[in-house]
Amino acid sequence: MEEKKNVIIIGAGLVGSLWAVYLSKAGYSVTIYERRPDIRKAEISAGKSINLALSVRGWTALDAVGVGDEIRKIAIPMSGRVMHDLTGNLTYQPYGKEGQAIFSVSRGKVNATMMDIAEKHGNAIIHYNHDCRKVDLKNGIVWLTNNLTGEEIEAKADLIFGADGAFSAVRYNSMQKLDRFQYSQNFIADGYREILLPANADGSYQMDKNALHIWPRGRFMLIALANEDGSFTCTLFMPHEGGENAFDKLTSKEAVDNFFKTIFPDFYTMMPNIADAWEDHPLSALAIVRCYPWAHGKTALMGDAAHATVPFYGQGMNAGFEDCTVLNNLMHKHNHDWEAIFAEYSKERKPDGDALQDLSLENYYVMRDFVADPAFLLRKKIEAKFSEMYPDKWLPLYSQVTFSNIRYSVAYNQGKVQSEIMDQVMETPEIEQKWDSQEVMDKILSLC
């Protein structure tokens, strides 16, 4: 870079804060505008889910700019899922090989840490309480309003990044006004509500903290991730309305109490006052946002602004962080030629965003309907056995997505091939008895 370029990032969330560190380290002058107050000072939620799952793609992006160790201090490893059935029986399924884990992290703590790093180490300037009203995409001009004072501001930059979430103002107020801009927003039939399961009186955990807990119940499910303070953030995913079990049926304390007592009995014993805590968090919707192109002129979208997805693969934050990795690699590949960078970023990254959205929806059905199914568990055991014997021939789809940096689009396509192979394998006579036999392993090998 011949001269120091000025960059504006709209959104001081997880992706915006991390990208500010990348740009600052690359010699750019960075200013961030955030519509919310400073979450480090205000008594507000960091928005959306309290807990997130951090995996290899996220760590890759964090470690590349030397901030991974700061986040590891506040991360809890989860080596597998624990399924809770109606009678309280537990079934454990490891996520990957021995020693592999995903990490439960607090959205608020990660966000606050990233803001600190962006300001202190990245020399970024963050302006809070500023709403983005409009962006001149080609000329790099942003119009904002201070939502406390009403003051209107015009800011100019060499580059603008919209990292302002699924309901991005950059996208809505500017990108979506472009001719032939492709855009769709689809809400799924299910919503979610969070519940905080407190620690025991002595501060200890009520369940194994090193696992993601799932109560699969067919059309709906409850999950729980551990927090640092001994509590668990639990999330109930269920249809908004229709059917016997839906959020529109849980309109009284009596209904909530009876629902948990009947459907999640072991959870109810840990939190008999669930009905009193029910209203602590609002009922929220789940949306998938697809759009294209992700960049135009001097402006690009990142994270949820470009590819918001449902949370059922635990990859939303990881995908947003991977956007930083991809843009950083392109920045060096094209020697800071942003016209070339944006063109390749938009074209090459879009298929991965689409694939992740498809993977996330499909994994919802897996988590909801199949994780407690003996045939599904056997299928996963066979895959794990074959992968252990022939690691160069088979990496399970979950491991491709969670424990590697393989492109989402490549993983998705490989997963389809693997699924077809396993469908044939599961038709083997007496598969339950000889699942780990050489005969079964040879059959998979012949189909690969």
Predicted regions and their residues:
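Extreme N-terminal leader/targeting segments of oxidoreductases
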Residues: 1-7, 25-26
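Conserved N-terminal helical subregion
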Residues: 2-5, 55-196, 446-447
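Conserved mid-domain beta->alpha element of the FAD-binding
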Residues: 9-20, 25, 161-162, 195, ...
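Conserved Rossmann-like nucleotide-cofactor binding loop
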Residues: 15, 38, 167
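Glycine-rich FAD pyrophosphate-binding loop
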Residues: 24-47
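Acidic/histidine metal-binding catalytic segments
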Residues: 73-77, 125, 264-279, 335-344, ...
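Conserved FAD-binding catalytic core of PHBH/FMO-like flavoproteins
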Residues: 116, 130-134, 139-282, 286, ...
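C-terminal helical "tail/cap" subdomain of flavin- and related membrane-associated enzymes
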Residues: 329-448
